[in-house]
UniProtKB/Swiss-Prot annotation:
Statement: the UniProt record of this protein carries the keyword Membrane: yes
Transmembrane segments: none
Name of the protein in its database record: Elongation factor 4
Broad class of the protein's primary localization: membrane
Catalytic activity, as annotated: GTP + H2O = GDP + phosphate + H(+)
NCBIfam families, sorted: lepA (TIGR01393), small_GTP (TIGR00231)
A GO molecular-function annotation: guanosine tetraphosphate binding
C-alpha cells in the first residue's frame, strides 16, 4: 500500500489538465504510441468536439520512480467548468492528493481557487504545477507569486512543465510520489468501498467506479450495497489503464471498476458504500453532499410516441450524472415530458445533446428558470421551479428569489466594464481585493440573472480574461412577476416566464415582437399578447394571408365590392373561431434569446 498514490488533476478551464494526463499516460506506458491520441481520456465525442472535459475519468498506471521503486498511480482527470464542479468534488473524495495545474500565461483564475479550496476542505495534499511554460507569454515567476498571494499555498518551488511538449512532466511525477501521502486503511478489515461514479452499459448493466477504503474485494465475492441492503455478485472487476483491464482482486487503497450485473439503475447509487455480505462493515463511508440543481427546464419529446424511450434514456443518463434531477410534467401545449433540474446552462445543453445523440431523441426545451421560494397568504412556504406552478398573484404574500454569491477574478483594466455588467444584472458588491494587477470581486447577483447569460457577457466584456465561480447563498424577497403569453386569447403555459417587475415591460415587449417573427402567417389574424395577471402589457399581431377577392370586379360598383369584402370577413371570423395555431420549436427558444440582440 505504501507505493499507491491516488490523486486528481484539478484546474481552471483550458489550463491543460487533459493534455497533462495524456503525457503522464505516455510516460508510464499506459498506451502504445499507436493508440495514443490527443485528450485520450475525453472519450465522449461531445467532449472532443467542444474541447472540454465533462466526465471525470480514472486511470491506473505503474511508474518507475528515480528511487528505484515502482509506484501505482491512480489518477482522475476532472472537468474545469463550474457546471461540473460536483464531478470534481466526487473525484477528490477518492484521493489523498491533487495536482493543481495553473497556466503560466493566464495565472490563477476563479475555478483554480474554487477547486483548490474544495481539495483543502477535504484535507488533501495540493501540489501546484505551472503548465504551458513553452508559451511566449508565460511568466512563471509572476504566476508563482499569484498562487501564493491568492490561493495561499507555497509555490516557490512549484514544478514547471509544458504538457504539450512534455518538458518537465517527469519532474511532476517525481514530486507527486514524494509529496502525496499513500492511502490509509486496513487491508485485513471488513470491506468498505466507495462508489465514485457509475454508468450504464447495454451488455453488462451498471458499471461502477469504486475506491477501496478498507479490506479487499475479490472476483466472485458477494457484495452488499449498504443503503439498500441489496446483495449482488461481483462478476468482473478491474482497472482502467485507459483500457478496461480485468483483475482478480482490488486491494485496499486502489481505484477500479466493478460489474455486478445490476439491471436496476437505482441499484448502486453514487456515493454509497459497498461491503461484503458475509462480513459487513459497521459504518457507512461519508458519501457526497447532494448537489441541488440551480436551473430547471421542461424537456418534451417532439413526438409523443417517444415518451417511454425518453423516460428510459433519462434514467440511464441520471445514473451517470448524479446531479440530474427529473420529474414527469405535462403541458397543454407540448404534451407529456419531464421537468429536469441542471447545475447550469452548459450542463443543460450537454444533457440535451447527449439525449439527442446517444439515445436518438428529438426534444423541445422550455425556457430555463430557477427555484423561487413563495410564501402564500396562508403562510405556507412552497418552492416553485416552473412558472406554471406559481400561485395566483392575490395568493402570494411574498416571493423570494435565489441570490448567488459570485466570485470573479479579472485584470484591473476590465474592472469598469465588469462592474457595469454586474449592476445591470441587479448585483450588489460585497467585496473587492487587489492582488498585483488582478482584482478579486465578490458580488451578490440574483441566480436568475447569473444562469441566463451572465457568463457569456462577462467573458465578452473582459475579452475572455475574467473568470467566474458562483454558489447559492440565500433566498431574498424581491418584486418578481409572471409574464404570460396569450395567443389568440389562450395562455400558452410553456412560454410563461418569471422576471423582475422593472424588466417585465421590456421583456414582455421583446418576447412578443420576437414571437411575431417566428410564428408563420395563417389564414386569420393571430394576436400575441404578454400579460401580467389580467393586465396586458404588450401586443402584436401576425397579419392574415388573404385572397384578393376584388380581382374579378374590374370597374364595378362599390356596393358589389363591399359585399365581397364583407363575405370574406365573415369567413375569416368563422375560421378564427375554430382555427389552431401551430407553434414552431424556435418560438420556445425565443425566450432564451430575449434581450440578447439589442445589446
Amino acid at each position: 500500500m505504501k507505493n499507491i498514490r491516488n490523486f486528481s488533476i484539478i484546474a481552471h478551464i483550458d489550463h491543460g489538465k487533459s493534455t497533462l494526463s495524456d503525457r503522464i499516460i505516455q510516460i508510464c506506458g499506459g498506451l502504445s504510441d499507436r493508440e495514443m491520441e490527443a485528450q485520450v481520456l475525453d472519450s465522449m465525442d461531445l467532449e472532443r468536439e467542444r474541447g472540454i472535459t465533462i466526465k471525470a475519468q480514472s486511470v491506473t498506471l505503474d511508474y518507475k520512480a528515480s528511487d528505484g521503486e515502482t509506484y501505482q498511480l491512480n489518477f482522475i482527470d476532472t472537468p474545469g467548468h463550474v457546471d461540473f464542479s460536483y464531478e470534481v468534488s466526487r473525484s477528490l473524495a477518492a484521493c489523498e492528493g491533487a495536482l493543481l495545474v495553473v497556466d503560466a500565461g493566464q495565472g490563477v483564475e476563479a475555478q483554480t481557487l474554487a477547486n483548490c479550496y474544495t481539495a483543502m476542505e477535504m484535507d488533501l495534499e495540493v501540489v501546484p504545477v505551472l503548465n504551458k511554460i513553452d508559451l511566449p507569454a508565460a511568466d512563471p515567476e509572476r504566476v508563482a507569486e499569484e498562487i501564493e498571494d491568492i490561493v495561499g499555498i507555497d509555490a516557490t518551488d512549484a514544478v514547471r512543465c509544458s504538457a504539450k511538449t512534455g518538458v518537465g512532466v517527469q519532474d511532476v511525477l517525481e514530486r507527486l510520489v514524494r509529496d502525496i501521502p499513500p492511502p490509509e486503511g486496513d487491508p485485513e478489515g471488513p470491506l468498505q468501498a466507495l462508489i465514485i461514479d457509475s454508468w450504464f452499459d447495454n451488455y453488462l448493466g451498471v458499471v461502477s467506479l469504486i475506491r477501496i477504503k478498507n479490506g479487499t474485494l475479490r472476483k466472485g465475492d458477494k457484495v452488499k450495497v449498504m443503503s439498500t441492503g441489496q446483495t449482488y455478485n461481483a462478476d468482473r472487476l478491474g482497472i482502467f489503464t485507459p483500457k478496461q483491464v480485468d483483475r482478480t482482486e482490488l486491494k485496499c487503497g486502489e481505484v477500479g471498476w466493478l460489474v455486478c450485473a445490476i439491471k436496476d439503475i437505482h441499484g448502486a447509487p453514487v456515493g454509497d458504500t459497498l461491503t461484503l455480505a458475509r462480513n459487513p462493515a459497521e459504518k457507512v463511508l461519508p458519501g457526497f453532499k447532494k448537489v441541488k440543481p440551480q436551473v430547471y427546464a421542461g424537456l418534451f419529446p417532439v413526438s409523443s410516441d417517444d415518451y417511454e424511450a425518453f423516460r428510459d434514456a433519462l434514467g440511464k443518463l441520471s445514473l451517470n450524472d448524479a446531479s440530474l434531477f427529473y420529474e414527469p410534467e405535462s403541458s397543454s401545449a407540448l404534451g407529456f415530458g419531464f421537468r429536469c433540474g441542471f447545475l447550469g446552462l452548459l450542463h443543460m445543453e450537454i444533457i440535451q445533446e447527449r439525449l439527442e445523440r446517444e439515445y436518438d431523441l428529438d426534444l423541445i426545451t422550455t425556457a430555463p428558470t430557477v427555484v423561487y421560494e413563495v410564501e402564500t397568504t396562508s403562510r405556507e412556504v412552497i418552492y416553485v421551479d416552473s412558472p406554471s406552478k406559481l400561485p395566483a398573484v392575490n395568493n402570494i404574500y411574498e416571493l423570494r428569489e435565489p441570490i448567488a454569491e459570485c466570485h470573479m477574478l479579472l485584470p484591473q483594466a476590465y474592472l469598469g466594464n465588469v462592474i457595469t455588467l454586474c449592476v445591470e444584472k441587479r448585483g450588489v458588491q460585497t467585496n473587492m481585493v487587489y492582488h498585483g494587477n488582478q482584482v478579486a470581486l465578490t458580488y451578490e447577483i440574483p441566480m436568475a440573472e447569473v444562469v441566463l447569460d451572465f457568463f457569456d457577457r462577462l467573458k465578452s466584456t473582459s475579452r475572455g480574461y475574467a473568470s467566474l465561480d458562483y454558489n447559492f447563498k440565500r433566498f431574498q424577497a424581491s418584486d418578481m412577476v409572471r409574464v404570460d403569453v396569450l395567443i389568440n386569447g389562450e395562455r400558452v403555459d410553456a412560454l410563461a416566464l418569471i422576471t423582475h417587475r422593472d424588466n417585465s415591460q421590456n421583456r414582455g415587449r421583446e418576447l412578443v415582437e420576437k414571437m411575431k417573427d417566428l410564428i408563420p402567417r395563417q389564414q386569420f389574424d393571430i394576436a400575441i399578447q404578454a400579460a401580467i395577471g389580467t393586465h396586458i402589457i404588450a401586443r402584436s399581431t401576425v397579419k392574415q394571408l388573404r385572397k384578393n377577392v376584388l380581382a374579378k370586379c374590374y370597374g364595378g360598383d362599390i356596393s358589389r365590392k363591399k359585399k365581397l369584402l364583407q363575405k370574406q370577413k365573415e369567413g375569416k371570423k368563422r375560421m378564427k373561431q375554430i382555427g389552431n395555431v401551430e407553434l414552431p420549436q424556435e418560438a420556445f427558444l425565443a425566450i432564451l434569446h430575449v434581450g440578447k440582440d439589442n445589446k
